[in-house]
Amino acid sequence: MPTTGHVYGRSDNLSVQQTEGLIALLEGAEAALLFGSGMAAATSVFLALDRPTHVIASKVMYWGFRSWLREIGRYGHRVSFVETSDLKAVRDATLPGETGLFWIETPSNPLWTVTDISAVAEIAHGCSAVLCVDSTVATPILTRPLSLGADIVMHSATKYPNGHCDVVAGSLATARGGQLWDRIQKTRGHLGNAISGFDAWLLMRGMRTLDVRVRKQSQTAATLAARLVGQPAVSMVLYPGLEHHAGHEVALRQMIGGFGGMLSIRVKRGDEAAIAVAASVAIWKRATSFGGIESLIEHRASIEGESSPCPGDLLRLSVGLEDADDLYVDLERALALTV
């Protein structure tokens, strides 16, 4: 029985390895692994831990993963949800000898809070912990967390890397191998949560246009954010590229070439008005995902349910490749119905 090469598709295949190589190149990584979803990639990190540990995680993050983190006590892990943009709060939550993993999402979904990766890396490594960064929103085009001190970077490759809303995938990349990385790779094989060869091929197809898509989406998002500030029906615009955004200075340092294609707005008339806006647009698609070529709008609290910490008047906007003026006029018309 051969012990090298491509033996069984559940472990890997050539298409998967080629796409992993491209991800590693984009991230400046030593190695990368592809999974069947972003959740599969993220949860594999925790399942590969060799002992119960204390975890510090971003308070604001993708709700699906936050829900899973609240369940991992059965594995012996303890999670402290911290506002990771507040470095004092991060330091205060750190338990020397107990904290083994930091998990930060930046910019964080859906408030787009920005965490200083380099500063948190210093805190994490000061207590011999591993820093993992969910950089799905920034993409490797705008931020390379490994170059800022992160040990592992995670992406929901369903989003920007694929970019066409026809693949579900996730990725991990590491600055250096080691025992944890080896266990993650074994965990993927044991659980059978690797991506299929065909989906890896589709993902590679999407990644060929990643740079041009992300830069266009970032440019359009910045234009929309600036125009929505002061819009009569909008009480707040959340976007790291705006000077008044709390994380703008950090974003200037760590996001190179743009601030991403995601923004959120809060509607003055409240929850029902926000839902009405989402239902009244024509060009924006009402759907839950982001990073694709079509612009999407969603009432995030409705998606997350009653336990959601997301404000009920918030609409999350994923900017696609449509014309910025067309997108603004469509949104402005829907907002005008609530005034």
Indicate residue ranges for each PLM-predicted region.
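Short, well-ordered beta-strand elements within core beta-sheets of diverse protein domains
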Residues: 203-212, 260-268, 315-320
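A common structural junction motif
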Residues: 191, 280-291, 334-339
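Positively charged, small/polar-rich N-terminal and surface patches that mediate targeting and assembly
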Residues: 14, 236, 291-293, 297-300
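PLP-dependent enzyme catalytic core of the Aspartate aminotransferase-like
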Residues: 80, 91-95, 213, 279, ...
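A glycine-/small-polar-enriched, mobile loop at the entrance of the PLP active site in fold-type I
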Residues: 1-25, 30
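Conserved small-domain helix->loop->beta segment predominantly found in fold-type I
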Residues: 222-282, 301-309
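Conserved PLP-enzyme active-site core in the AAT-like
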Residues: 31-233, 238
